[in-house]
Amino acid sequence: MDSAQNFFLTGCASGIGQHLADRLLANGHKVWATDVNLPALTRHAELQHWPEERVRVRQLDVRNAEAWDAAVNEAVSELGSIDVLMNIAGYLWADKFYEMPAEEVDLNIDVNAKGVIFGTQAAARQMIKQGHGHIINISSMAGLVPIQSLAIYSASKYAVRGFSLAAAQELRPHGIFVTVVCPDAVETPMTARQRERAEAAILFSSPKLLTVEAVGDAIIRRVLTHRPLELYLPIHRGLLARLTDLFPSLAFPLGPLFAKRGRSHQLHMRKDAKAS
């Protein structure tokens, strides 16, 4: 990926999307940066002095298929093409599935699953005309293995992964690549909101959360360069997740162990926060 390309990103007001927008602009690319939270996105763009000649900041609710079509059409009319779509916007709230309000179920499914589907549809229609393109969809380790207290989130991320793998088969004959990225828990504002919640303990079972920088490095250096069908971050956690998915009964003994480890990490995080 030596020459400048046109990127369309969602979820750019914070977290992975924000970091990737910063990196891509620093590398000389053109970026169509979107988020449902336009004020936060605009503030970041101004603070980071995003180059106006290579970036456009737009509001986009990924749950709205018509909004997607309008956004892609506007981007193409100005940029001429969309070389890479990154579906990054996501939503997470840990809770027992039987206690989760309907509106929380809707947010998980609509943002995480339908948002990716609508975005991939809109971009694919344009990329088929172009004869090339790369679609990168962010799933999760929760899309590889079912996780207690994240049943609805897991369902949405399983949907992202399954859809992406199937879409890749349909789009490859048109010269379009699809990559699904499955990261472990990442240190983002969305994850930070779960730190105090007992239901979210398993999110913090890894000794250290992934950073947005680590995820960004993997996407820029590996995904954009090699266009793999699937990427696990980190690979050893991904392989463990696949093993548990292959033998689902393993989740019964392993789940409580990971949750216990996560609670311990949450406690240390709270102590560190108080100390600072």
What are the residue ranges of the model-derived segments?
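Active-site helix of classical SDR
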Residues: 120, 156
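Canonical Rossmann dinucleotide-binding motif of NAD(H)/NADP(H)-dependent dehydrogenases/reductases
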Residues: 2-32
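Alpha-helical segment proximal to the catalytic Tyr-Lys
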Residues: 125, 169-170
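Substrate-binding pocket helix/loop in short-chain dehydrogenase/reductase
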Residues: 96-97, 101-106
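Residue(s) in the substrate-gating loop at a strand-loop-helix junction
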Residues: 140
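Conserved glycine-rich Rossmann-like NAD(P)H-binding loop of the short-chain dehydrogenase/reductase
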Residues: 27-43
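SDR active-site lid
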Residues: 173-235
